[in-house]
Swiss-Prot record:
Pathway: Membrane lipid metabolism; glycerophospholipid metabolism. It is found in: Cytoplasm. Substrate binds at D134, D181, H265. Belongs to the glycerol-1-phosphate dehydrogenase family. This is Glycerol-1-phosphate dehydrogenase [NAD(P)+]. Its EC number is 1.1.1.261. The keyword ATP-binding does not apply. The gene is egsA. GO terms for molecular function: glycerol-1-phosphate dehydrogenase (NAD+) activity; glycerol-1-phosphate dehydrogenase (NADP+) activity; metal ion binding. Binds 1 zinc ion per subunit.
Length: 359
């Protein structure tokens, strides 16, 4: 028997850490906008605010916000037209003396507030007037470029105030687009799991579970998503918030952005403005679910029940443009591995597009 001392193996030390940024307050519901002063009083971000809105959303909700805050806060106004470098610079200058920012509007306005507040290190409050995509709560923003758009890092809002009465009166196409954005989570998480198996990419089971559950609930309640219904706005906004939280938990957009989003960005480069973000992702999700061998018909059926497009024809987009977008998707964020990065041929892409029209 050996008399050598026993060697005790020391396991490697645990060294994981993650900084998860989430909104401090989230208020969703009927006349929620009237409780904005209470939210601000709870957060205590300061006394001077830059109120950012769009030309239309200024009338829809921006003026209301200004009126309910003017007696307690120093309110300055900024109207964000198109989101570009000049607008961001002008907004930055306008916000130089503000303690915090409030974005009242759709995706463009919220992204403007998100980017400017992030660069200046100031908090911002998100007051969406439409439920068109999960950017109302996420820490990423979409910045248009000459060749389409790019996703840039920012930080999530310190608070979200979503008035379901206002949101329900927005064009139904916007809400249907938001639904499609959430439903596309199904294929986003399949792509993430694929990257984990083939490339060793780290995944978050918590983020995946939340993202999938959010998509499942929206599919289950698809028949309730009707134009002008405040209950529909309630369901969709909660889903968008949950989807945004899943990204915050993951520390990236992975649980809500896969090949269907790469396809969507490629389509935007080829035909800018032809489809809303969520609409493109919804159609992309039908095709990528087919490639994953999943139930693509269920996704298509759910989108149709909500009123979101399921074919290029509904958006007046030529089929060959969709084929080209599928082929170019691999060039979008090449570091993000998805099912579209596994050697899709043009012939297969053409088959995918024709499959969209099958009964």
């Amino acid at each position: 028997m050996s008399t050598d001392p026993v060697q005790v193996l020391q396991p490697d030390g645990f060294n994981k850490s993650r900084w998860t940024q989430l909104p401090r307050d989230v208020l969703i519901g009927h006349q929620a906008i009237m409780q904005l002063p209470d939210i601000i009083a709870d957060i205590k971000p300061g006394r001077s605010v830059l109120l950012i809105s769009g030309g239309t959303t200024r009338e829809v909700a921006g003026n209301t916000v200004a009126d309910i805050l003017k007696d307690q806060y120093e309110v300055r106004r900024f109207v964000a037209g198109k989101l570009d470098a000049d607008t961001l610079e002008a907004c930055s200058q306008a916000s130089s003396s503000a303690d915090f920012l409030i974005g009242v509007g759709g995706g463009r306005v919220i992204d403007c507030a998100k980017i400017v507040s992030y660069k200046q290190g100031k908090p911002f409050i998100s007051v969406p007037t439409a439920a068109s995509h999960d950017g109302i709560i996420s820490g990423r923003a979409t910045l248009p470029t000459e060749t389409g758009s790019v996703s840039v890092g920012a930080h999530p809002p310190i608070a979200v105030v979503a008035d379901t009465g206002i949101i329900s009166q927005a064009p139904h196409r916007l809400m249907a687009s938001g639904c499609a954005d959430v439903i596309s989570n199904y294929t986003a998480i399949l792509d993430w799991e694929l990257a984990h198996r083939l490339r060793g990419e780290q995944i978050s089971e918590y983020a995946i579970a939340l993202s999938k559950m959010t998509a499942e609930i929206l599919v289950k309640d698809a028949n309730l998503i009707k134009p002008g219904q405040e209950e529909a706005a309630w369901i969709v906004v909660k889903a968008l918030v949950s989807s945004g939280v899943s990204m915050a938990i993951a520390g990236s957009s992975r649980p809500a952005s896969g090949g269907e989003h790469k396809f969507g960005h490629a389509l935007e480069r080829l035909m800018p403005g032809a489809a809303l973000h969520g609409e493109a992702c919804g159609i992309g999700s039908i095709m990528t679910m087919y490639l994953h061998g999943g139930d693509w018909r269920e996704i298509r059926s759910s989108l149709a029940r909500i009123g979101a497009p399921t074919t290029p024809r509904e958006l007046n987009i030529p089929d060959e443009v969709i084929v080209e977008a599928l082929m170019k998707a691999r060039d979008i964020r090449p570091e993000r591995f998805t099912i579209l990065d596994m050697g899709l041929t043009r012939e297969s892409a053409e088959h995918l597009v024709q499959m969209l029209y099958e009964e």
